[in-house]
């Protein structure tokens, strides 16, 4: 049984509230879970009280092989429970084709202006 530490949505329409739960990876988002280990209220204005975690139980479930989802991993990294690896996107920071064409055209114009007549 693959375990996930993930978010389960609660609250009313347009007022989300999430429970951080340990659940089987195959169960629905708001379905059956094994244990509730925290909560996240994204509507609160300050970051501190937004996230509440039961760190002892989370450590236990991580030891049992539960894998946190990306959003939960961000919370765990913020409190120092589990390190979130940096993503490697080498092509994302590069400009697109049109931008590269504009840059090369600007370089050619600059070279032509700086060349002696």
Swiss-Prot record:
Top-level taxonomic group: Bacteria
**UniProt KW keywords:** Ribonucleoprotein, Ribosomal protein
Residue stretches of biased makeup (Basic residues): 81-90
MF (Gene Ontology): structural constituent of ribosome
Which PANTHER family does this chain map to? Answer: 30S RIBOSOMAL PROTEIN S16, SMALL RIBOSOMAL SUBUNIT PROTEIN BS16M
Q: Where is this region: Disordered?
A: 81-117
Which SUPFAM superfamilies would you find in this protein's record?
Ribosomal protein S16 (SSF54565)
Output the InterPro entries linked to this UniProt entry.
Answer: Ribosomal_bS16, Ribosomal_bS16_dom_sf
The protein's matches in HAMAP family, at most eight in alphabetical order, are given as: Ribosomal_bS16
Q: What are its GO cellular component terms?
A: cytoplasm; small ribosomal subunit
Q: Does the keyword Repressor apply?
A: no
Enumerate the Gene Ontology biological process terms.
Answer: translation
Native source species: Bartonella quintana (strain Toulouse) (Rochalimaea quintana)
Give the record's family classification: Belongs to the bacterial ribosomal protein bS16 family.
UniProt protein name: Small ribosomal subunit protein bS16
């Amino acid at each position: 049984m693959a375990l996930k530490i993930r978010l389960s949505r609660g609250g009313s329409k347009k007022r989300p509230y999430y429970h951080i739960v340990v659940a089987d990876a195959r169960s629905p988002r708001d379905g059956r879970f094994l244990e509730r280990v925290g909560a996240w209220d994204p509507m609160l204005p300050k970051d501190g009280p937004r996230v509440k975690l039961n760190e002892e139980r989370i450590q236990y479930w991580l030891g049992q092989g539960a894998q946190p989802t990306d959003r939960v991993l961000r919370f765990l990294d913020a409190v120092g429970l589990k390190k979130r690896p940096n993503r490697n996107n080498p092509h994302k920071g590069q400009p697109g084709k049109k931008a590269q064409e504009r840059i090369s055209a600007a370089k050619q114009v600059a070279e032509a202006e700086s060349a002696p007549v």
